Amino acid sequence: MERDCDIVDLDQPSLGTVISIKDGSTPTDISTTSSTTEDKLCSGCGCLIKDRYIYRVMEDSYHESCLRCSCCQLSLSSFKKCFSRHGNIYCEHDHQMLYGKRCRRCMTLLLPTDIVHRVHFMYYHAQCFSCCSCQRPFNLGDEYHVFDGEVFCRNDYQSICNFQTISNPDPLMEEVVRSEIHRKTPKRPRTILNAQQRRQFKTAFERSSKPSRKVREQLANETGLSVRVVQVWFQNQRAKIKKLNKKDSDSGDTFKHGPGSEGRSTEDIRSSDDEEESVINLDADEVETSETSSYTDPIQKLYNMTSSQIYFPYHS
């Protein structure tokens, strides 16, 4: 966490050197010597230099016509200084364009006369130093935070941390948090219960599967969750119990639908399940994924039917 920012003048010798020359780029003075004393090979064309004068750049020798910028092919014989990088020769302008420092926000070149803000390895124009999310400019003394290579104000950084704590407790899921920073549409929150909260919910469910509002509010205060989350959990739990009971009833050998039997039909049970399922899916908070009704084997259903339910056509 950074609590203030550094203002750096690129005219200073320390940063002036960094901006104009870095990573092997070496400014060299171009000197000329007489070629009468010894023969030299041109580093540009590879031919023997027989001219009256030899142009030297560091340890290399050039013809006057061969000493050119590798980018724009400008003749450097009339310049007092050039730049060498990875065996290539550049004029000052092209070297700045290719290897000069750039503003992190607008990506334009930083000039030696610019006043810039430096944050770790990043550089910003004074007018470009602002929050990546809300675009609010920073002033001297303002608190800012660096996350994923971007600068955020305190409020936006707190929002990112809260989102990471609620939706992604696992630090290995940091990539998901990064993608959510630039989302335009909000994502539905998902509540994950810990072991203590699950035990409290199960204990309350054993007492009553449909607790009153007062009990739900008390349970919400004890667990630190909202009343709506508590209500959704009980709805999901009742739906699961109902499904398991229905599955056991369909697979049991003693369960039979006689002419005088009481109870709801299969259509009534499916309709009730669909109704409760719709209530769960319309909630804004998701506690656990609700399960759909199980599939009943038609052969097993036929096996459980009594003879009075099976129609035998009369044959004369």
Swiss-Prot record:
Residues 244-297 are annotated as: Disordered. Transcription factor. Required for the terminal differentiation of sensory- and motor-neurons, especially GABAergic neurons, and for morphological aspects of uterine development. Plays a role in the cell-type-specific regulation of glutamic acid decarboxylase unc-25. Involved in promoting sleep-like behavioral quiescence, acting by modulating expression of transcription factor aptf-1 in the single sleep-active ring interneuron RIS. Plays a role in regulation of RIS differentiation. It is found in: Nucleus. It comes from Caenorhabditis elegans. InterPro entries: HD (IPR001356), Homeobox_CS (IPR017970), Homeodomain-like_sf (IPR009057), LIM_Homeobox_TF (IPR050453), Znf_LIM (IPR001781). One of its GO terms (cellular component) is nucleus. GO terms for molecular function: DNA-binding transcription factor activity; DNA-binding transcription factor activity, RNA polymerase II-specific; metal ion binding; RNA polymerase II transcription regulatory region sequence-specific DNA binding. Residues 40-101, 102-163 form the LIM zinc-binding domain. This is LIM/homeobox protein lim-6. Gene3D superfamilies: Cysteine Rich Protein, Homeodomain-like. Keywords: DNA-binding, Homeobox, LIM domain, Metal-binding, Nucleus, Repeat, Zinc. The lineage of its organism: Eukaryota, Metazoa, Ecdysozoa, Nematoda, Chromadorea. Residues 186-245 bind DNA. Residues 246-256 have a biased composition (Basic and acidic residues). It comes from the Eukaryota. Residues 273-289 have a biased composition (Acidic residues).
